[in-house]
Every structure is written in structure tokens, then in C-alpha cells.
Amino acid sequence: MVLIVALVMAQSPKFVHEVTASYQKQTMHGFTVYVSKAARANPADTDPALDLLRDELAEVVALVPAKALATLRTVPVFIENNNPGFPCAAYHPSKDWLKENGYNLDKARSVEISNPKNFVAWVKLNQPLMVLHEMAHAYHDIKFGFSDPYIGAVYKLAQTSGTYDDVGHNRGGTRRHYGLNNQQEFFAEATEAYFGENDFYPFNRAQLRAHDPKAAEMIEWAWGASG
């Protein structure tokens, strides 16, 4: 067993954090997308991910208030080829963290598609607004900071209410709501529910307003949304 693992590791190329100049730059719906050299060398996984990303960004443009798009479009998207640091996608808020972990510092305040194959599979399986979720992290960070007292207070109310401890999931059954993990995830999950469809209950805007009206008000305040 140890020998098999060693052979697999020996045959798997080590992930390389590329410099920005090695990425191919594209524009999708006003968003800047950087595709790594390694990702371009794996079109079987990367091309479907780029097609899906284009659709997901179009959905972001269609769903969020127009005045928020100026902020979102400052957030670049980096496409990698199976970065083992993240299973699918992530938002990078901290240049210090990037430096400590050997990442390209230009990824500060960017969204990274770390694993194109998982990105396509997971979006199609049950996370239709994954890109909006990651962009919500960026918006939260850039506009308010992750220590915003108002967002934090609404999160704390949800956390202590018990109403998110055991909720429906779009794959069936009930689970602890992912938004309970921290203020950032609570904001991103509520954003998905308000503007489209989330994988945890409350799944949509009407349910969010009924289940947690303060969270709905928070989203309307943050994004300048109404209706």
C-alpha cells in the first residue's frame, strides 16, 4: 500500500505556483480571467470549466444589482490545474497568507478555480451559484471587511437562534447549515439564497425572508437590493 502511494506521488507532477506573466488573460462579461499554463495544457478539464465560468459570470451579471458589478469586476478569476490546496474554488483575501504559502501575490482579492474538473461537477451536482458564492466573499471583504459589526451581529443572531442547526439540503435530508461556520460563509450563503438558489434551506428569497428576515434585510442593505 505504501509503495502504491509512493508511486502515485512520484508520477503526479508537483503543483507549480506560476507567475502572472505565464497566464493567458481573457475577459468574460467584464471580468478578467487568468488561465494558467498548466491549465491550458489540460484542455479536457479546462475548456468545459471556462465554458461554465462564462455562464456563471453571466448569471452573476444578471442577478446582482448593477451598481455592485463595478466592485465585483475588480476581482480577477484565476484558473489552475488541480491546485491541491483547495478542492474546487476559493476566494483569496490575504496577501500575507499568499506569501506565507508560496502563492502568487497577484491573487490577493481574487477568486481561484483550483480544480476545473471538480468545479464543473460540483456546479452541476448541487451548487449552481458557486461563482456568485465566491464573488460574495470578495464583495463582503472589499466593501465592508470580514469584521463588519452589522453583518457579524446578524450572523450571531442566526448562530444562537438554533434555526440553522438542522435544515433541509437540496440533495435530501437535513444538515447543519454551512453558513454557521463563520460570518463570511453566512453572508455568501444568504447572498445565494436571496439572488438565486442555495443548496441549504432557506433555498430562495421567499424562504430567506420567512426563515430569517434579518438576513434578508442584511443582503438588501449590503447589495443595495430590493424586491
Predicted features by range, described:
Residues 42-53, 124-132, 144, 177-184, ...:
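Solvent-exposed, acidic/flexible segments
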Residues 36, 50-160, 216:
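Acidic/His-rich structured neighborhood in mature extracellular/periplasmic domains
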Residues 11-25:
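Short acidic, Pro/Gly- and aromatic-enriched capping/linker segments at domain boundaries
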Residues 43, 146-150, 202:
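Residues in and immediately flanking transmembrane alpha helices
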Residues 95-121, 125, 153-227:
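Metalloprotease/metallohydrolase-associated module, dominated by Zn2+-dependent proteases
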Residues 3-11:
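Hydrophobic h-region of N-terminal signal peptides that target proteins for export
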Residues 23-27, 66-69:
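Short secondary-structure boundary/capping segments within folded domains
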Residues 25-47, 115:
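Acidic/histidine-rich, surface-exposed loop or edge segments in extracytoplasmic proteins
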